[in-house]
Amino acid sequence: MSEILDLSFLSEMERDLILGVLQRDEELRKADEKRIRRLKNELLEIKRKGAKRGSQHYSDRTCARCQEGLGRLIPKSSTCVGCNHLVCRECRVLESNGSWRCKVCSKEIELKKATGDWFYDQKVNRFDYRTGSEIIRMSLRQKPAVNKRETAGQSLLQQTQMGDIWPGRRIIQEQQQREQSVLFEVPKTRSGKSALEAESESLDSYTADSDSTSRRDSLDKSGLFPEWKKMSAPKSQVEKEIPPGNQNAVCGDEGDMVFKKNTKKVLRPSEYTKSVIDLRPEDVAQESGILGDRSKSVPGLSVDMEEEEEEEEDIDHLVKLHRQKLARGSMQSGSSMSTLGSIMSIYSEAGDFGNISVTGKIAFSLKFEQKTQTLVIHVKECHQLAYADEAKKRSNPYVKTYLLPDKSRQGKRKTSIKRDTINPLYDETFRYEISESLLAQRTLQFSVWHHGRFGRNTFLGEAEVHMDSWKLDKKLDHCLPLHGKISTESSPGLPAHKGELVVSLKYIPASKLPVGGDRKKSKGGEGGELQVWIKEAKNLTAAKSGGTSDSFVKGYLLPMRNKASKRKTPVMKKTLSPHYNHTFVYNGVRLEDLQHMCLELTVWDREPLASNDFLGGVRLGVGTGISNGEVVDWMDSTGEEVSLWQKMRQYPGSWAEGTLQLRSSMVKQKLGV
């Protein structure tokens, strides 16, 4: 019974679907068995025709298959290499290599190939013959076990017993003992249960405890309406808090990084036509109140608040997060640890550059091919770069280029690494496919980095070329001096246009909500409904190599930043002006609460096998920098963002529409207050 799977979490509809698949599998299996029987019958028929009968007399010089005479002179080549019988020319079957076999031997080989007997002959000696469909069918027949509450002592005891036997070693022992024809029994633990059963119960108790803890945390943190003061906690306390059930949990302090994989995938409710999830405390308790991670490519956002992307993490992501955490801890302690370099595009901009005095120049040439609408960049060499390791007089420089404001993964080009030199010679060519009109709005950035150990790269300098000042019909050969980092605020010449987002807002008071609908009572009274209609985006930044983006919009109603407050539109593929036409709905919102709230909308490019790329964002709120009497970074709305939010509050029950410029960074903006 150790092979039985725990399928108690499946619903009735899912069980029916699986049984339907198993039924089709059984039909295909029967059809294949019928084909094999037909081939075996053909082989038996050939053998029957060549069988010698006792009523007849046969000579020694007859064909072993058709019993015809072979004559007096029989050459040695008339013997079959498979069965060593004499065979006439009519009963031979030529093979691809020029040799031949008799009909019976040839048919037997064909039968083994067609039926897979050559594999199953060895499989029977090594494995128990039990198909996956049989195991699933047996598991579905088994009744789900009753959920029993276990004590912490029982859970720890079972985990200790489970750790005594490594699963990989157990499998090796099983295979070795089967080969020696020794009956193998699953080792029993001290509680009288098999190790696999103990492991299963231990896992169940862990997930049950994790689920109950996450529900308690969600109740504590979800007092958004109207009691937010309970959820305001010191930043250090929030950073030390470990969200239970989170896919990547960080245990201990920032220096001691231990990642755990979530052992239980939370089953999501069925999809709605609108993103409707009630935010009242009694409903939030049913959600997983987990503070998620935000996506890795947002400039200016805390690593601790980066959002988990639907259980899609892999080991590369964990390593990146580990390195980012180490670098952030280094900056907080005031040390001069090197930056993360090219681990990710955005995080190349992070780090402490005060310990490196930027020197040197970079030589390059530019050419624009009108026929193919391609910018060709020839990175030639660098002169007199700074030493990344002053003590050892060592630098391993490489050059990275971007067409700003696009700092996506697809927009990055990188040279090879030249080791132990401050005068590297590259002679490498990069190409950007971009139209002439769009190129005039970009700025070409060269940045030079030292490649250090463990991915800790050091910034050595950068230079920019404003493409609107260059005549594209002429080839440009230039040698620019390198300089230190220039912030976006101190360099207004750098283009920061990320596109526009068209949204409509409407607040419906509780008195105007339909009776019997989503209208529910919260502790502070009845709450209304906030509707956010995401209509379209215009002129987004191209994140894909073909000059397009697969974009979607993600929303949070701050100060609550968890899955209960998260909304997402569908992904619009291969367009820079997508029409989303999707509505976010937040229930249980009171009109007076809107003074202390902020709606954050961010646009992302979808990357299936990696972290998503940030394309821009907006924050809609009153823009005072204060929420519920406390200074917060996210209440930084300006201009049209404030006007649209105030218009929505001023006219309840009516749509307020606006076109908002997307921010290039979600760092706190300077407020004119």
From Swiss-Prot:
<keyword id="KW-0472">Membrane</keyword>
<dbReference type="InterPro" id="IPR000008">
    <property type="entry name" value="C2_dom"/>
</dbReference>
<dbReference type="GO" id="GO:0006886">
    <property type="term" value="P:intracellular protein transport"/>
</dbReference>
<keyword id="KW-0479">Metal-binding</keyword>
<dbReference type="GO" id="GO:1905684">
    <property type="term" value="P:regulation of plasma membrane repair"/>
</dbReference>
<keyword id="KW-0677">Repeat</keyword>
<keyword id="KW-0862">Zinc</keyword>
<dbReference type="GO" id="GO:0008270">
    <property type="term" value="F:zinc ion binding"/>
</dbReference>
<feature type="modified residue" description="Phosphoserine">
    <location>
        <position position="275"/>
    </location>
</feature>
<dbReference type="Pfam" id="PF00168">
    <property type="entry name" value="C2"/>
</dbReference>
<keyword id="KW-0597">Phosphoprotein</keyword>
<keyword id="KW-0968">Cytoplasmic vesicle</keyword>
<feature type="region of interest" description="Disordered">
    <location>
        <begin position="184"/>
        <end position="253"/>
    </location>
</feature>
<dbReference type="InterPro" id="IPR011011">
    <property type="entry name" value="Znf_FYVE_PHD"/>
</dbReference>
<dbReference type="GO" id="GO:0005543">
    <property type="term" value="F:phospholipid binding"/>
</dbReference>
<dbReference type="GO" id="GO:0050714">
    <property type="term" value="P:positive regulation of protein secretion"/>
</dbReference>
<protein>
    <recommendedName>
        <fullName>Synaptotagmin-like protein 4</fullName>
    </recommendedName>
</protein>
<dbReference type="InterPro" id="IPR041282">
    <property type="entry name" value="FYVE_2"/>
</dbReference>
<comment type="function">
    <text>Modulates exocytosis of dense-core granules and secretion of hormones in the pancreas and the pituitary. Interacts with vesicles containing negatively charged phospholipids in a Ca(2+)-independent manner.</text>
</comment>
<dbReference type="GO" id="GO:0031267">
    <property type="term" value="F:small GTPase binding"/>
</dbReference>
<feature type="modified residue" description="Phosphoserine">
    <location>
        <position position="490"/>
    </location>
</feature>
<dbReference type="GO" id="GO:0032418">
    <property type="term" value="P:lysosome localization"/>
</dbReference>
<dbReference type="GO" id="GO:0005886">
    <property type="term" value="C:plasma membrane"/>
</dbReference>
<feature type="modified residue" description="Phosphoserine">
    <location>
        <position position="202"/>
    </location>
</feature>
<dbReference type="InterPro" id="IPR043567">
    <property type="entry name" value="SYTL1-5_C2B"/>
</dbReference>
<dbReference type="GO" id="GO:0042043">
    <property type="term" value="F:neurexin family protein binding"/>
</dbReference>
<keyword id="KW-0863">Zinc-finger</keyword>
<dbReference type="GO" id="GO:0030658">
    <property type="term" value="C:transport vesicle membrane"/>
</dbReference>
<feature type="domain" description="RabBD">
    <location>
        <begin position="4"/>
        <end position="122"/>
    </location>
</feature>
<dbReference type="InterPro" id="IPR010911">
    <property type="entry name" value="Rab_BD"/>
</dbReference>
<dbReference type="InterPro" id="IPR037303">
    <property type="entry name" value="SLP-4/5_C2A"/>
</dbReference>
<feature type="modified residue" description="Phosphoserine">
    <location>
        <position position="205"/>
    </location>
</feature>
<comment type="subunit">
    <text>Part of a ternary complex containing STX1A and RAB27A. Can bind both dominant negative and dominant active mutants of RAB27A. Binds STXBP1, RAB3A, RAB8A and RAB27B. Interacts with MYO5A.</text>
</comment>
<dbReference type="GO" id="GO:0001778">
    <property type="term" value="P:plasma membrane repair"/>
</dbReference>
<dbReference type="Pfam" id="PF02318">
    <property type="entry name" value="FYVE_2"/>
</dbReference>
<dbReference type="GO" id="GO:0005768">
    <property type="term" value="C:endosome"/>
</dbReference>
<dbReference type="InterPro" id="IPR035892">
    <property type="entry name" value="C2_domain_sf"/>
</dbReference>
<feature type="domain" description="C2 1">
    <location>
        <begin position="358"/>
        <end position="480"/>
    </location>
</feature>
<dbReference type="GO" id="GO:0045921">
    <property type="term" value="P:positive regulation of exocytosis"/>
</dbReference>
<dbReference type="GO" id="GO:0030141">
    <property type="term" value="C:secretory granule"/>
</dbReference>
<feature type="zinc finger region" description="FYVE-type">
    <location>
        <begin position="63"/>
        <end position="105"/>
    </location>
</feature>
<dbReference type="InterPro" id="IPR013083">
    <property type="entry name" value="Znf_RING/FYVE/PHD"/>
</dbReference>
